């Protein structure tokens, strides 16, 4: 531990923020190891609980990102800001939601619609697949909403991230885990 002026509590699930006279007074939590309910008294609180990405049906977020920290802050009367913004990672395996690293696009992967078009040409002709996440995410949604996506399971339509043109050697050297994930969880070999 680099700093000694705090104590770290792993395997605790915070449940409530205690506010007294409009000031932070403490926090309640459950010790996940033994199930005990614990009260922490304090003078200050930093909330770093992640977002709420798991609220969406298809997401690359981990199972723990359910908005509990945001809800806890809201219940305590703390102001929340910019709640309409949720950062999405634009590429994941359908239907599992396993994240496919942006490195796959960085190494030269193409986003293609069901007609085989590299549709990023319409939205970010200079940056193409290397455009920022928000642009890539909106572009994918536009393609799907306008009927150019692939029909997926349970109405979960999608586009393709095509790596085949990179060749086996480059994929095995630069993206071996992506190949392994695609084979194991999507039944597709990108080479």
Segments the model singles out, each with a brief description of its role:
Residues 2-14, 80-83:
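A conserved beta-strand/loop element that lines the FAD pocket in flavoprotein oxidoreductases
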Residues 42-45, 65-72:
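Extended, hydrophobic alpha-helical segments in both membrane/secreted and soluble proteins
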Residues 33-44:
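Core beta-strand elements of the Rossmann-like FAD/NAD(P) dinucleotide-binding domain
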Residues 72, 78-191:
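An anion/pyrophosphate-binding glycine-rich loop and adjacent beta-alpha core
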Residues 8-24, 29-30, 174-191:
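A glycine-rich dinucleotide-binding beta-alpha-beta segment and adjacent secondary-structure elements
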